[in-house]
Structures are given as C-alpha cells and as structure tokens.
Amino acid sequence: MVNPGVHVPAAGVLVHKLRPNDVEQGIPPAEALAELRQFIEDKVLVGHFVHIDLNVLRKELGDERHQLSNPAIDTARVHRWLLQNGPWKEDLEQQMANISLAALAGIYNLDFHEAHHALEDAFVTARL
C-alpha cells in the first residue's frame, strides 16, 4: 500500500474502497515507484485500457531517464481485435458497446465481484 501523504478523498473511499487508515502505514510514493520499476524491469505489461495506467506511471516517474518503455498489451484492444476479426462480426455493434472490465468478464464467463479493487482487477485482467 502507498501512503500518498495527503488526505484520501471521499471518491477514493467510494470507488476504490481505500480508507485513510488503509494508507497510513503505506510506503512513500517514491519508494513504491522504485520498487515497481525494479519489479517490472523489461517485462511485458498487461492491462485493461493499459494506456491510462501507463500515462499515470509516466507522469509520476517524471524524468526522462525513468520513462517506461515496456511493451504493453491492452485487453480492451485485444477484445476489439477479436470481435473485428473473429466469427462474432454479426454481433460487433452490441459487443463493442461496453468493453469495461466487468463487461468482458461477463462475456468470457469470468468471476468478477468488485470493480476498481486493484487485486480483483489485476486477477480478472490476467485471466482475460
């Protein structure tokens, strides 16, 4: 857990279920980013709408020496490609209407209980 050093806004509590006491014992953002950078090194990153996560990380990393250059796979784009190139073309409009992580979990019959919960989102994304 990361302690942002600022008050956790109500939206963070509602959407991500993060309470102030959840982050109080967390590590500082700089330490978390250093650990993350070391962990991902040259690995392929996978995410749902992964460009959003990458943009946030690039902004937080700040200087050019640490910019992320990892290859990335976006599960939303993979799903879109499958729809456009697979046997489901007749359902394309309906299937493309909602490509949220929860919607894709439903389409692919994956258990998904709690959106915007980091571990749950990561687990479902990995299964996609």
Q: Predicted regions span which residues?
A:
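Short gly/pro/ser/thr-enriched loop/turn and capping motifs at secondary-structure boundaries
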Residues: 76-80
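Conserved non-catalytic scaffold segment of RNase H-like nuclease domains
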Residues: 1-70, 84, 91-110, 116
